[in-house]
């Protein structure tokens, strides 16, 4: 009888542990959960920024590097790439439901999502909607994720929707600890972002 009770209790404990892993966020690593929660709340309120940096892209058919400019104003974004993959300049602008892509020497294209545009015109399967969160060092809130925290309770590694993101360097800007270098690995695309200048702002208050 005692053995049965022990086995039943062990099974319940195992199931409880598995249930925890299927929640929206599964936390691992050295960091403190409460400190991460506070850090996450602060960054979630950040709804505007300007980024200048470099981007490296490796895809099955081509690869290269270029410069990155990213202007975010709440739901509106303006992302510009110059020089990657020998394509010249590309500019992605839009908000939810209305997105435009301009490619130098090719023209202007429109779609309802940035993911559809980039895959159709450039062949890149890149979750831009998630990038709005990942670039701040946060998981996207609408799907499950596995988080590994560093000793400072910031993201060291993120796994979400088939992507792995590694955060190797942070810097403090205007009271926010923000990623300076991150590597994104997808099924057929690798992206490295090196951010030279972060200008974070809050517009929603």
UniProtKB/Swiss-Prot annotation:
Q: What's the chief localization of this chain?
A: membrane
S-diacylglycerol cysteine-type lipidated residues: 18
Lipidation annotated as N-palmitoyl cysteine: which positions? 18
The record's subcellular location field reads: Cell outer membrane
Q: Which CDD domains match?
A: LolB (cd16326)
Q: Where are the transmembrane segments?
A: none
Q: Name one GO cellular component term.
A: cell outer membrane
Would you identify the family this protein belongs to, as annotated? Belongs to the LolB family.
What role does it play? Plays a critical role in the incorporation of lipoproteins in the outer membrane after they are released by the LolA protein.
Q: Which NCBIfam families match?
A: lolB
This chain belongs to the protein called Outer-membrane lipoprotein LolB
Organism the protein comes from: Pseudomonas aeruginosa (strain ATCC 15692 / DSM 22644 / CIP 104116 / JCM 14847 / LMG 12228 / 1C / PRS 101 / PAO1)
